[in-house]
Amino acid sequence: MSRKMLVTCALPYANGAIHLGHMLEHIQADIWVRFQRMRGNEIYFVCADDAHGTPIMLNAAKQGITPEQLIEKAKADHVADFKGFNISFDNYHSTHSEENREITTEMYKKLRANGFIKSRVISQLFDPEKQMFLPDRFVKGTCPKCKAEDQYGDNCEVCASTYSPMDLINPRSAISGATPIVKESEHFFFDLPNFEGMLKEWTRSGSLQSEIANKMQEWFESGLQQWDISRDAPYFGFPIPDAENKFFYVWLDAPIGYMASFKNLCDRTGLNFDEFWKKDSETELYHFIGKDIVYFHSLFWPAMLDGCELRKPTNVFAHGYVTVDGVKMSKSRGTFIQASTYLKHIDPECLRYYYAAKLNERIEDLDLSLEDFVQRVNSDIVNKLVNLASRNASFIAKRFEGKLADKLEDEALFAEFIAQSEQIAAHYENREFNKAIRLIMDLCDKANKYVDDKAPWVIAKQEGCDAQLQAVCSMGIELFRVLMSYLKPVLPQLAERAEAFLQTELTWDNIQQPLLGQNVAPFKSLFSRLEKKQIDAVIEETKALFAAQNKEKGKQKVENTENTAVEPIAAEITIDDFAKLDLRVAKVISCEAVPESNKLLKFQLDLGDHQRQVLSGIKAAYNNPEELVGRFVIMVANLAPRKMKFGVSEGMILSAGTGGADLFLLSADEGIRPGMQVK
């Protein structure tokens, strides 16, 4: 019996380009959706741009355009990238749509009527220059606990303390630099704790990934909190009904964007929207997401749906991050690759295959090893799969006018290939794509061994062996057809070219139907080898792209610094006070971003006779920390080690500037050595 399913991908933020990290999720979901279609299931695949929030509002203002213009351009770019990678969405929409506004407003009113919306007056920092309330991330100042400077408004990344933005010492607006004032404002909260029982039951259902279920248990033990779903004007988003100058927080209307995109599809095609979203729906709902947004999709989203008497997701499938050559994607190394850059140089099917060969059902990071990428694509797709067709097709075309034999040369081998159909299907269904690829390639090896053993090039030279030659080559092509059918969800473009050659549609139902006595088209090249020079071209273009961006940012940084008022000189100290500081020259051995922190870089420093680890809050100023390797810095060497949230920091690196992106490391003339004392 055919299943009815709705599948979504997380909504890309309309404030930046699609990169290969995004593509992992969309390729994973697309393979799963294409497989379900091949199995005859009724499935709909939708997505949208996440188009609201303060960052979009500020970026648009910076560019001198409206937020609507910004998100329109982003959507066009995103759609082109996904089309380039053959992501087969049935609909791609935007959260800044009439459908989303209507559904968001309706759900809010339902939650309010059911008693799940609370309100209370809170105190917030307000930028008097920009005339706007400041979200926590747009307030910076000195930590009230450890006195570390340039900390965000909700937590210190040096001592890991949490606090209110009002507790910051010398707070300033990260937008204008102005000193904020305190103003009161009424905010609206979603009563998440009310849904703890339902969420626990949903967690125990056994359908969620074990990693998600375990993480949810940790959140339950920590205690669920009411969720602030409102933001004050100015804000780019939907206004809250009956609340002047209040807007829905972006994370409220973002997941509702799944519903809005599907509603847009339903309105265009006549599908029954309610059938998929009503509380007792018998359809299936799946969300593919990254591990960084599990919190919203496993707590807030199902609770909101339940509070509105709607169905909950059947499952939430989370995946890990993409690394390149074992490390985080890097702009300076050219591995922070945008989808559009990749598509200029490399066939998208290459990446689809490589990701599929490594994807499993767990929440694990996937490493794109560039050397392995080239080797695996050429070995599996070109040398094994496509070569299987080409080495047999030439004989069929030249000697038999494209006509295949009337019967199978090796029925047992064909039956062995067909027998793996349900196992391969199970691997696809369970998102164990790596296992499916491994099994398919094992069959591909057997198919090539069959051809090697039969040696049609030898048979072709023997008198009176035409029937045997036709049978062997037809068998090779038949096995290629089966393999291509299994790989169609992963390689849709190659499958389309194979269908043109075989003159038949590749479906799961007809896998076991051999092409006996039928004609195939003249063979044309199906796939090109992946060359290292193509990888190099992508890397170099990526480096150039971000070098140009950094140059422009550096120019703006200098201009901003020149226009910044000089801070007043601090109170006088004695020479004895200064003598207490032991300043040393240190050489940077390694430097990397702390993934869990918005601010910290982790340095390994050489001080001549020993090494130290130092955590420094200069991440915003140095987007490419690996470029600092080999550089000399000045550090306070006799500062007591400090145990921080992300490790122990054994000193302090000196820098100048007002904070955030306006920080500059101090350096010295040539000839200095690690460990030299600064006097």
Swiss-Prot record:
It catalyses: tRNA(Met) + L-methionine + ATP = L-methionyl-tRNA(Met) + AMP + diphosphate. The lineage of its organism: Bacteria, Pseudomonadati, Pseudomonadota, Gammaproteobacteria, Pasteurellales. ATP binds at K331. A motif ('HIGH' region) lies at residues 12-22. A motif ('KMSKS' region) lies at residues 328-332. It comes from Actinobacillus pleuropneumoniae serotype 5b (strain L20). The keyword Metal-binding applies. GO terms for cellular component: cytosol. This is Methionine--tRNA ligase.
